């Protein structure tokens, strides 16, 4: 594997994503500038300037015309992906933690953090309704939680959303019936859910948690199907689009490393078999924990973002492409 | 290089000026596998540079939307940058090998290491005897075996101490024999005489190894006799011959052979 190493961020990465065709890579970090890159040669096209704090999440619409960023400066911004202009700004009283587009690209969901008297919230806004996209606009879906919502994701068209919480709880809401969650799973994880990613065909969810496991979930009822155990907190997990493989990335936080008796390390990305729940391969590269990762739609590339501020685009070689899992 | 080689046997070179001119012309060569090597010359601040670029042209079918996105204009921090990757943001990192923990035969390769790590991480109990992490020392199932081992170790230590002290029977006997053979007894010793004076007196005869003045256990006063050990028996004999009956202070010394105690 001859990886590309992209240095466009000054601080730790928080999210990398591919667009639908996989030719662009979107990344954001704890500095203020989300970036967009060509996946093929690692060329940076531009940065979206305007945020005033750490950018926690970025998402791109299906047609790669818009992208949305959630930031610690209490705003969610929607950008023109091609020109880098800010189209809309959504304000709130507390930092924004995650954001995502719906399947059609018309709805934007985001979660806000719990802070002093403000509860953690999950909101959805419609980009087509101009009254929702102005300063002081109201979301058409609004839900409050006592515990921090860490990640949110549209899991079925424009109707169902799944929210992961700091306590390990997972909840699924139907936007057409906003009162109560339609599915709840509180036993899948014991600690914070760090990442939720959908499989490319939309039939599975994978959740990564700080309890050193990642779980494969049924997208329709949040039932746990498989569990993948690691030796380190899992910060991100992704599913291969064309093979039964799972990739986990994680590692101890920098501030925790000196407090553990075990030597530091284990910053590799690990590849597991989806069905047999066993690790069969690993590759290293980052000097520090892996904070986020995404699998390319072609199945031959994985992008990882690390605590060291680098994005690595790893293209698999023949060893992996020719590998068959013997059981 | 190929051009230079081709030029060497060329008969039409008639002057050095023409040859130099040909060498300075930019040209392109094509390799067998489709790679192209482009050679160009540039002059910066009066210094001529030869720039060799090697690349490969690949035609790839992509969806139209992907082809359209290839024409995006740079914005933000990259405003005004030319097309192509920039060295400030993009570079090819070192080769990374993917490690397979299960080879094609399905064997687990890294299992032992991982198990150790896991045990270390999770267990707080530690056994001194078998170094395991799943129980305390008092509950060790192999305690009896390890205790026997410990007793054997203790015996070894004791033996070591004996050897270190030099308490072997052979060594002791040899030392005692030598000491008794070369020792003479001094009686009628004045009380005022101390060890230094005695050493001075007997040192004239030969090398003195040991001097022992007998003292009362309670009062600490000399008892009036002493033992002097010489290095060789000849010295002891000479001391007896010369120092017997000499007058020290107000007493007449009596120097004679030591009688064996056993």
UniProtKB/Swiss-Prot annotation, chain A:
SUPFAM superfamilies: WD40 repeat-like. Transmembrane segments: none annotated. Keywords: Cytoplasm, Initiation factor, Protein biosynthesis, Repeat, WD repeat. GO terms for molecular function: RNA binding; translation initiation factor activity. It comes from the Eukaryota. WD repeats lie at residues 8-49, 51-89, 188-227, 229-268, 285-324. It holds the Pfam family EIF3I. Changing residue 252 to R: Represses the convulsive behavior due to cholinergic hyperexcitation caused by an acr-2 mutant. One of its GO terms (biological process) is cytoplasmic translational initiation. Its main location: cytoplasm. InterPro entries: eIF3i, WD40/YVTN_repeat-like_dom_sf, WD40_repeat_dom_sf, WD40_rpt. The keyword Metal-binding does not apply. GO terms for cellular component: eukaryotic 43S preinitiation complex; eukaryotic 48S preinitiation complex; eukaryotic translation initiation factor 3 complex, eIF3m. It is found in: Cytoplasm. PROSITE patterns: WD_REPEATS_1, WD_REPEATS_2, WD_REPEATS_REGION. Component of the eukaryotic translation initiation factor 3 (eIF-3) complex, which is involved in protein synthesis of a specialized repertoire of mRNAs and, together with other initiation factors, stimulates binding of mRNA and methionyl-tRNAi to the 40S ribosome. The eIF-3 complex specifically targets and initiates translation of a subset of mRNAs involved in cell proliferation. Belongs to the eIF-3 subunit I family. Component of the eukaryotic translation initiation factor 3 (eIF-3) complex. This is Eukaryotic translation initiation factor 3 subunit I. It comes from Caenorhabditis elegans.
Curated annotation (Swiss-Prot), chain B:
Component of the eukaryotic translation initiation factor 3 (eIF-3) complex. RNA-binding component of the eukaryotic translation initiation factor 3 (eIF-3) complex, which is involved in protein synthesis of a specialized repertoire of mRNAs and, together with other initiation factors, stimulates binding of mRNA and methionyl-tRNAi to the 40S ribosome. The eIF-3 complex specifically targets and initiates translation of a subset of mRNAs involved in cell proliferation. This subunit can bind 18S rRNA. GO terms for molecular function: mRNA 5'-UTR binding; translation initiation factor activity. HAMAP family: eIF3g. Residues 182-260 form the RRM domain. PANTHER family: EUKARYOTIC TRANSLATION INITIATION FACTOR 3 SUBUNIT G. InterPro entries: eIF3_g (IPR017334), eIF3g_N (IPR024675), eIF3G_RRM (IPR034240), Nucleotide-bd_a/b_plait_sf (IPR012677), RBD_domain_sf (IPR035979), RRM_dom (IPR000504). Belongs to the eIF-3 subunit G family. CDD domains: eIF3G (cd12933), RRM_eIF3G_like (cd12408). Keywords: Cytoplasm, Initiation factor, Protein biosynthesis, RNA-binding. One of its GO terms (cellular component) is cytoplasm. Disulfide bonds: none annotated. It is found in: Cytoplasm. Its main location: cytoplasm. This is Eukaryotic translation initiation factor 3 subunit G. It comes from Caenorhabditis elegans. The lineage of its organism: Eukaryota, Metazoa, Ecdysozoa, Nematoda, Chromadorea. Disruption phenotype: Abnormal morphology (dumpy phenotype), slow growth, sterile and in severe cases embryonic lethal. The keyword Magnesium does not apply. Changing residue 130 to Y: In ju807; represses the convulsive behavior due to cholinergic hyperexcitation caused by an acr-2 mutant. No effect on binding to target 5-UTRs. GO terms for biological process: formation of cytoplasmic translation initiation complex; positive regulation of translation.
């Amino acid at each position: 594997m001859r990886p590309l190493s992209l240095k466009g961020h000054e601080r730790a990465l928080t999210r990398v994503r591919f667009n639908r065709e996989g030719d662009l890579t979107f990344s954001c970090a704890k500095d203020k500038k989300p970036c967009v890159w060509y996946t093929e040669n690692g060329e940076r096209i531009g940065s979206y300037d305007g945020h005033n704090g750490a950018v926690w999440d970025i998402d791109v619409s299906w047609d790669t015309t818009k992208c949305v960023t959630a930031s610690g400066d209490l705003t969610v911004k929607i950008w023109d992906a091609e020109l880098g202009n800010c189209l809309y700004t959504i304000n709130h009283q507390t930092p924004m933690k995650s954001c995502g587009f719906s399947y059609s690209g018309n709805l934007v969901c985001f979660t806000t953090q719990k802070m002093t008297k403000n509860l953690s919230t999950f909101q959805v806004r419609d980009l087509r309704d101009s009254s929702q996209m102005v300063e002081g606009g109201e979301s058409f879906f609004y839900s409050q939680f006592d515990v921090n919502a860490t990640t949110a994701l549209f899991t079925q068209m424009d109707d169902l959303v799944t929210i992961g919480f700091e306590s390990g709880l997972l909840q699924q809401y139907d936007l057409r019936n906003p009162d109560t969650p339609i599915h709840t799973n509180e036993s899948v994880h014991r600690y914070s859910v760090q990442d939720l990613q959908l499989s490319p065909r939309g039939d599975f969810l994978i959740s990564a948690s700080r309890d050193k496991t990642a779980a494969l979930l049924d997208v329709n009822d949040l039932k746990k199907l498989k569990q993948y155990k690691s030796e380190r907190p899992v910060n991100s997990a992704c599913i291969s689009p064309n093979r039964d493989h799972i990739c986990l990335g994680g590692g101890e936080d920098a501030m925790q490393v000196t407090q553990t008796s075990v030597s530091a390390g284990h910053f590799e990305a690990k590849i597991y078999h989806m069905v047999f729940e066993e690790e069969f391969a690993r590759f290293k590269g980052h000097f520090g924990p892996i904070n986020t990762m995404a699998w390319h739609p072609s199945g031959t590339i994985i992008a990882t973002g690390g605590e060291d501020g680098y994005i690595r685009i790893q293209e698999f070689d023949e060893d992996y492409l020719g590998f068959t899992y013997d059981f | 290089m190929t051009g230079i080689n081709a030029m060497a046997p060329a008969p039409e070179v008639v002057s050095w000026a023409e040859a130099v001119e040909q060498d300075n012309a930019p040209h392109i060569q094509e390799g067998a596998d489709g790679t192209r090597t482009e050679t160009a010359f540039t002059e910066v601040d009066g210094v001529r540079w030869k720039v060799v670029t090697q690349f490969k042209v690949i035609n790839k079918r992509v969806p139209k939307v992907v082809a359209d996105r290839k024409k995006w204009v740079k914005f933000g921090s990259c405003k005004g940058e030319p097309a192509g990757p920039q060295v400030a943001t993009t570079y090819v990192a070192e080769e990374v090998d993917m490690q397979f923990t299960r080879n094609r035969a399905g064997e687990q390769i890294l299992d032992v290491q991982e198990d150790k790590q896991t045990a270390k991480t999770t267990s707080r109990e530690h056994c001194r005897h078998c170094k395991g992490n799943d129980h305390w020392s008092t509950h060790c199932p192999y305690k009896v075996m390890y205790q026997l081992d410990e007793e054997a170790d203790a015996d070894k230590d004791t033996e070591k101490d004996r050897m270190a002290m030099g308490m072997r029977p052979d060594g002791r006997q040899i030392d005692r024999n030598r000491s008794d053979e070369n020792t003479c007894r001094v009686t009628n010793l004045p009380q005022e005489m101390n060890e230094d004076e005695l050493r001075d007196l007997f040192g004239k005869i030969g090398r003195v190894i040991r001097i022992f003045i007998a003292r009362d256990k309670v009062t600490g006063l000399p008892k009036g006799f002493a033992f002097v050990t010489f290095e060789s028996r000849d010295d002891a004999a000479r001391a007896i011959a010369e120092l017997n009956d000499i007058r020290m202070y107000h007493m007449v010394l009596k120097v004679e052979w030591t009688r064996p105690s056993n």
